[in-house]
Amino acid sequence: MAPNDTISDMLTRIRNACAVRHPTTQVPTTKMTRSIAQVLKEEGFIEGFEETGEGVQKYLVLTLKYKDKNRQPIINMLKRVSKPGLRVYSNCKDLPRVLGGIGIAIVSTSKGIMTDREARRQNVGGEILCYIW
């Protein structure tokens, strides 16, 4: 059965894989999950991702990133903000700073999916999808 909220599903799969220190995790491919994975890669939260599968069953295989030999995950917390039942929007002036700029907020804007810093730089607001730190 396909999940209704693909973003929450993606964040949960990443959170669970980090908790048990798996090197990779699979998430179903959508335009949104691909864009979020690209932002995570650009910000250094994951090492990379690749698309696998064919036809209807396509997946993104995310390669997770860990610190030092103790394999502490780079991603400490993933928090979904805007949900299907309660959307959260913000203009560019009111975009939140996550942990004083240490973390990021992923924002869906009219110019695509980007971080809160990039949205402020481009002077656009949008839907706050999630916080990551």
From Swiss-Prot:
Protein's UniProt name: Small ribosomal subunit protein uS8
NCBIfam families, A to Z: PRK00136.1 (NF001109)
The species this protein was found in: Rippkaea orientalis (strain PCC 8801 / RF-1)
Subunit structure: Part of the 30S ribosomal subunit. Contacts proteins S5 and S12.
Pfam families attached to this UniProt entry: Ribosomal_S8 (PF00410)
Keywords, ordered alphabetically: Ribonucleoprotein, Ribosomal protein, RNA-binding, rRNA-binding
Record-linked InterPro entries: Ribosomal_uS8, Ribosomal_uS8_CS, Ribosomal_uS8_sf
GO BP annotations listed: translation
Molecular function GO terms recorded: rRNA binding; structural constituent of ribosome
Family designation: Belongs to the universal ribosomal protein uS8 family.
Protein purpose: One of the primary rRNA binding proteins, it binds directly to 16S rRNA central domain where it helps coordinate assembly of the platform of the 30S subunit.
PROSITE patterns: RIBOSOMAL_S8
GO CC terms, sorted: ribonucleoprotein complex; ribosome
